[in-house]
Amino acid sequence: MAGIAMKLAKDREAAEGLGSHERAIKYLNQDYETLRNECLEAGALFQDPSFPALPSSLGFKELGPYSSKTRGIEWKRPTEICADPQFIIGGATRTDICQGALGDCWLLAAIASLTLNEEILARVVPLDQSFQENYAGIFHFQFWQYGEWVEVVVDDRLPTKDGELLFVHSAEGSEFWSALLEKAYAKINGCYEALSGGATTEGFEDFTGGIAEWYELRKPPPNLFKIIQKALEKGSLLGCSIDITSAADSEAVTYQKLVKGHAYSVTGAEEVESSGSLQKLIRIRNPWGQVEWTGKWNDNCPSWNTVDPEVRANLTERQEDGEFWMSFSDFLRHYSRLEICNLTPDTLTCDSYKKWKLTKMDGNWRRGSTAGGCRNYPNTFWMNPQYLIKLEEEDEDDEDGERGCTFLVGLIQKHRRRQRKMGEDMHTIGFGIYEVPEELTGQTNIHLSKNFFLTTRARERSDTFINLREVLNRFKLPPGEYVLVPSTFEPHKNGDFCIRVFSEKKADYQTVDDEIEANIEEIEANEEDIGDGFRRLFAQLAGEDAEISAFELQTILRRVLAKREDIKSDGFSIETCKIMVDMLDEDGSGKLGLKEFYILWTKIQKYQKIYREIDVDRSGTMNSYEMRKALEEAGFKLPCQLHQVIVARFADDELIIDFDNFVRCLVRLEILFKIFKQLDPENTGTIQLDLISWLSFSVL
């Protein structure tokens, strides 16, 4: 219940703008300005209690408390490491980012790319920090985390060994913005060791809030040049690199003056007419050096003489050192990998860019209710969360000769690095996209059934199921309605996720789920209509007071269920019996009279029939995944969120819902629906309660 309340509160805060870059969420409720001012007033340097200078902040295994790698480590402030520490000198450069004893080169490559864009760098690394003015041993940074900007505060105690920084450091040893940025990122992920191993695109996204895709240039898609042009039009960040095969290859220069293992940026893509034919050209920037391409279409290449002088002047006008043109074919031949970080509309301040349309949806997989696994598990796959995508407008131009709607889908699993300390790691995740059949178009209140997925193939799917934080793919489909189904590879895996869809044109996205509905069968009974046989049974069971209490009801039902071989049950708990009495006790006596007991008896027989029919394997019990169908048979349609609550409340560790819990669930639902209907006679879908009423209903 606490989790539901937290989600509701968070949704309300997000609607008010909390989590935007301008109103970043304070991680662990630590406010930078408040903490710094407190330290300055006290004349003390900040010590972060939430990420202490202790072995627990380093790691849990290779960097754990008893590891040889962590012996002799001392935590020191920059003022103790060098005579004149600086936060940042003359802007950020790649020499500020040298890898240490941590396998987070993926993160450092993303930081290096971040330095190519001063505006975006300043969002992540506030540049007005220093070791001189108002220095209090405290620094702050901003990261994008699953749709929200989060401000993280750290103290400046850094792990050292033999007087040297253990992890990332600057080449000169006196600049500390990158080391403190790495520490803040380690904090939000639980510890330094949690950063070991990852994809550069993960860092790209956490520094920009964008959605990052990458291409192996040995196997490029046929429309890659057009993809690059469109990405540049939309203000995306594009980076490329040449793979290295050994440590000796790092920073090695090829005979045509390209540097291996080096982060380049792509800044232009143009088609020019040369000697009667069209040439595709790519403009590359080497941001940290004068080393430039000497192959065809370099600055001094005679090929430029075959181009219209005005076009040539336009393209070769030098913006800054380190920028050069090369043919697209040479680009594919010499470079290994291209990464595109598509930025969100709020990141781009320039109105000249053609901005992506962005939608984000949050969801979760919960064991026993919405963690159905992939298509290999047909009995549970349909239980996964489902999202409707309505593609309405085609792209303005067909980049590959095919009309359609271009969109990117990114499925991110949340907080998995943080859980490495607890022995957890990334789930293997992926998704499928299904075309909505004509008879269901326009409906969002129907969770697609098991039979639909047994008879319908996916129209598109993620390239693979993989244990990375994000699975991302680019698609182009005709206008229409589609359902996206995210899943873990295996069922029964708990996890939170967010889905982001970037589309060229406006599209509509929403959760596909059953609407809340209760068709409760009202059993009409008059005492005169009750047969003599049932009257004699009631008189025998009720005793002299002609009423049945919850305790008497428990004894009666235990005897009844003991005779049934098709339902495994130890009888009903006293809690279940009490709420059954509460449901029908119209006179407030706390007991059931003849008519009330007759209605309850009829209901229990109906519950038995449903339970037996849903139990297809004749085990005498019900699996939690069968509960959804059982609730529908009983007249209740509920969204995924409520199924998660029901399974958490009524299923055991093996995801079994016994007959007692099944009945208790149905009775509680019936009571709650009836209360709501009484308090909402106009069917507005909303009621108001004071505290005493809320508490009275909550203890049911």
Curated annotation (Swiss-Prot):
Gene name tied to this protein: Capn2
The protein's name: Calpain-2 catalytic subunit
Annotated residues for binding of Ca(2+) 2: 229-230
Cofactor: Ca(2+)
Gene Ontology annotations for the cellular component aspect, listed alphabetically: calpain complex; cell projection; chromatin; cytoplasm; cytosol; dendrite; endoplasmic reticulum; external side of plasma membrane
Activity regulation field: Activated by 200-1000 micromolar concentrations of calcium and inhibited by calpastatin.
SMART domains associated with the record: calpain_III, CysPc
Cofactor remark from the record: Binds 7 Ca(2+) ions.
Function description: Calcium-regulated non-lysosomal thiol-protease which catalyze limited proteolysis of substrates involved in cytoskeletal remodeling and signal transduction. Proteolytically cleaves MYOC at 'Arg-226'. Proteolytically cleaves CPEB3 following neuronal stimulation which abolishes CPEB3 translational repressor activity, leading to translation of CPEB3 target mRNAs.
Keyword Repeat: yes
Subcellular location, record wording: Cytoplasm; Cell membrane
